[in-house]
Amino acid sequence: MEPTSRTFPTAVSSAQGDPRIAEITQRGVAEVFPGGAAALAERLATTDRPLRVKLGIDPTRPDLHLGHAVVLRKLRQFQDAGHVAILLIGDFTALVGDPTGQSEARPRLTPAEVEENARTYLEQAGKILDFETPGRLEVRRNSEWLARLTLSELIELQAQMTVGQMLAKEDFAQRYRSGTPIYLHEFLYPLLQGYDSVALEADVELGGTDQRFNLLVGRELQLWKGQTPQFCLTVPLLEGLDGYQKMSKSKNNYVGLTEDPLTMYSKLEKVPDQLVERYFELLTSVPPSELPADPRQRQILLAKTLVAQFHSSEAAEEAQRTAQALVLQGNLVETGSIPTFAIQCLSYPVKLSYILRESGLCKSAAEARRQIQGGAVRLDGQKVEDPDLEFAQASELDGRVLQVGKKAFCRLVVGTN
């Protein structure tokens, strides 16, 4: 895919005046090497062509979460500044398994698992990256070149690093000291990731702070092949909702990119106080000067901002109203635990008493009417008073929370056969 033509600044001083360059090189950045943020800013300001900016993601799990969004947003910033984002799906390296941060070897995935995960990754990355503007994005798979390496080429690649250099990687060093097995295929991983930069002729590579070693290997291999070595930009690892561990689905401290607005809002409005500013910095473009002084209002703004970002402003407003409505008698209902009821193939108008019966919240339509008359039924937290209440169309029901008494809830979802 050829990059679109574009006029770039020619003076280094423009780096100081271009807010896009400042955002790329400073906001939400842990480290830039070599030369720091100033060196990358100068390169961005003086380049006469779009830079090729690489981000590799191994599809080891089926879904993305906000931890992945941090580096994807950084890649989007390069896109918005006119550069070429390369989203590299590590379909080959996922079969090897990245040893970074692992106290033991990763379980091996099957090609079918990797392919299915890759499919969902691409769908979800579209919530952040620009997939529409011609020339702004290349989606590549490293099996394109890694699967074709011959044995002699692989030996030559391995000859570029020593065992001592590999053991300088902290994860390997800890396992070596503790006597935990290190398998030979794991030593290959940094070399394969580095070779990706050679194959793509990357100018910049992005990654989390835990990827520093692998990014540096990419620079060394580019030098070996006579290429100009890439800049490396790392972003912080996002702490999860527990407040201290890295966000991870396995730790159940995550917010998924595809979670519904109400669940996403309800999780985010409870982000620990000490992490709210960090979430704003890494996941939004809201300036620090615009953050409310009140800690609770900061949490609410964070939740609304991110729901709007991944869904819509309307969805964020509705999620806030519903979440507030679910604060009943001082007890917050955990919205993530509310079951859903799929309303399928109903003819409209439909009575609320029918839905109460079909959802199982009431045993019969007669009981449903009695519960309504007794003031026990609420819709999005608002008491329902009319036992004959009807809904004319599906949109009046979809996504709303129906409640009977203090503990019986369901979220209504309009489905189809």
Swiss-Prot record:
Localization annotation: Cytoplasm
Taxonomic superkingdom: Bacteria
Short name of one Pfam family: SYY_C-terminal
Uppermost EC category: ligase
Motif 'KMSKS' region in this chain: 246-250
Gene Ontology process terms (BP): tyrosyl-tRNA aminoacylation
GO cellular component, as recorded: cytosol
Motif, 'HIGH' region: chain positions: 59-68
Gene Ontology molecular functions: ATP binding; RNA binding; tyrosine-tRNA ligase activity
Entry keyword Phosphoprotein: no
First-listed, main subcellular location of the protein, grouped into a coarse class: cytoplasm
UniProt cross-references to PROSITE patterns, sorted A to Z: S4
InterPro entries assigned to the protein according to its UniProt record, in alphabetical order: aa-tRNA-synth_Ic, Rossmann-like_a/b/a_fold, S4_RNA-bd_sf, SYY-like_C, Tyr-tRNA-ligase, Tyr-tRNA-ligase_bac-type, Tyr-tRNA-ligase_bac_2
S4 RNA-binding domain mapped to chain residues: 350-414
EC numbers, comma separated: 6.1.1.1
Keywords: Aminoacyl-tRNA synthetase, ATP-binding, Cytoplasm, Ligase, Nucleotide-binding, Protein biosynthesis, RNA-binding
Protein family (similarity comment): Belongs to the class-I aminoacyl-tRNA synthetase family. TyrS type 2 subfamily.
Assembly, per entry: Homodimer.
Protein's recorded name: Tyrosine--tRNA ligase
Organism: Synechococcus sp. (strain JA-3-3Ab) (Cyanobacteria bacterium Yellowstone A-Prime)
Source taxonomy: Bacteria, Bacillati, Cyanobacteriota, Cyanophyceae, Synechococcales
Annotated gene: tyrS
